[in-house]
Amino acid sequence: MKKFLTLVLALVMALSRAACGGDKNKDNGGTDADASANKISNNLVFSTGGDGGTYFAVGGVIAQHVSTNTDVKVTSVASGGSKANILLLDSGDAQLGFSQSDVMAYAYNGTSTFADDGAITSFSTVANLYLEAVQIVTCDASIKTVADLKGKNVSIGDAGSGVYFNAIDILGAYGLTEQDIKPQYKGFSDSADALKDGKIDAAFVVAGAPTVSITDLSTGKDVHLVSIDKEHADALIAKCPYYMTITIPADTYKGLDGDVQTVAVGAVVLAADNVSDDAIYAFVSDIFEHTDELSHAKAKEMSIETAANITSVPYHPGAARYYAEKGITVPTK
């Protein structure tokens, strides 16, 4: 499956380049600049996330709706997640991509997971779509707090991924380090498989809830989510203000004993700066004028107010135009 998705991604990228052309370092400009052949206006590759995560599912729904109802054709593809998507935008291999709100800030400032890469500023914000909950998943009922993860086999996401840094932040809030656990570096689907097979004790999953991989796991195993208590959540947010508290309702997954308190980051759509203003305007307007037609539970959480609340990375001019029509001013380059 992964090999198939890789081949599809390579083919789509090749077709996109051939059809679109353009220099990704060209100026954003305004409506007049959009007429330039150097602006990409169609056949956009939307790099999402792993095939067991919410990025992949939501991205597919959005891509299909935009392609069907506008002149902009969008193809969603699986990817390695936030950091991989930003690198794909920068290289020109994708024109749209999902990112956690913390990871995009790391990229724009060249910090944390992007410390070795240096600052990447060739992308802009399109919309903050929904919150991604930090879900600490286990099938071991004896693991009740983050502190209980000490000495356990714990998947903390792919090395260098957004999930990895979220896990490190949360472990740190409880006085734990990576060395205090037996870390495993797995994506969502692989983590779910490892939990199912008893190869790991817990896994960090950062995605909109419900998440496909956890839902699937709960059909055959007793699944538990570990809460982050208010004291530790408040301390984490004071240190890392891009987190916010969130409650995962008990009915989100089969078998949960009650509501789960945790923290979350934003799920943000980004665009390469060389995508035309008109294309991004059409993309954004299609989402927010038709959220009731998007066949995914996360669509109910999407709002223009949330979409326009990012401050760490400026907005694409095409997105800014749409928000301005709704009476909201957002920062642009």
Label every PLM stretch briefly:
Residues 1-43, 333:
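Short, low-complexity disordered leader/linker segments with a strong preference
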Residues 41, 71, 81-84, 91, ...:
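Extracytoplasmic
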Residues 41-69, 73-74, 132-197, 309, ...:
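Bilobed "Venus flytrap"/periplasmic-binding protein-like clamshell domains
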Residues 59-64, 77-116, 139, 144, ...:
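Pocket-flanking alpha-helical
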Residues 101-103, 110-114, 178-269:
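Pocket-lining segment of extracytoplasmic ligand-binding domains
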Residues 105-110, 121-128:
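Short beta-strand-centered segments that line the small-molecule binding cleft or hinge
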Residues 131-143, 236-241, 262-278:
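A bilobed periplasmic-binding-protein/Venus flytrap-type ligand-binding module shared by bacterial periplasmic
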Residues 186, 190, 197, 207-225, ...:
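An extracytoplasmic/periplasmic, membrane-proximal ligand-sensing/linker region
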